[in-house]
UniProtKB/Swiss-Prot annotation:
Family: Belongs to the NPY family.
Keyword Secreted: yes
The protein's name: Goannatyrotoxin-Vere1
PANTHER family recorded: NEUROPEPTIDE Y/PANCREATIC HORMONE/PEPTIDE YY, PEPTIDE YY-RELATED
Keywords (A to Z) from UniProt: Amidation, Cleavage on pair of basic residues, Hypotensive agent, Neurotoxin, Secreted, Signal, Toxin
Coiled coil: none
Top-level lineage group: Eukaryota
Species of provenance: Varanus eremius (Rusty desert monitor)
Positions bearing Tyrosine amide: Y64
Broad class of the protein's primary localization: secreted
Tissue localization of expression: Expressed by the mandibular venom gland.
Range of residues in the leader sequence: 1-28
InterPro entries according to UniProt: Pancreatic_hormone-like, Pancreatic_hormone-like_CS
Amino acid sequence: MIASMKPWPLVMVAALCILFCLGTLVDAYPTKPESPGPDATPEELAEYMTKIRQYINLVTRQRYGKRSSPETLMSELIFGENSNSDHSSRSRFDDSYMW
């Protein structure tokens, strides 16, 4: 007899993997601080403002380095690394056919 596989275990495993991946993505992004409300003390407002400042600094921080988009990756594969900088630093007199 041939045992038939039921699809529900595979569906459950796939759903759990998707939920796990979504959970890690949600935890990676910082949450916005809660507002203290209209009747907050000056100390609570100062603490809220420092939390907001830290939140904004995290969300809008500059990312240093070259960003890799699919276009730049393909141009690096085809033309070699730093193909854009080669063209910008060359002069028109560097070409041998000019002389």
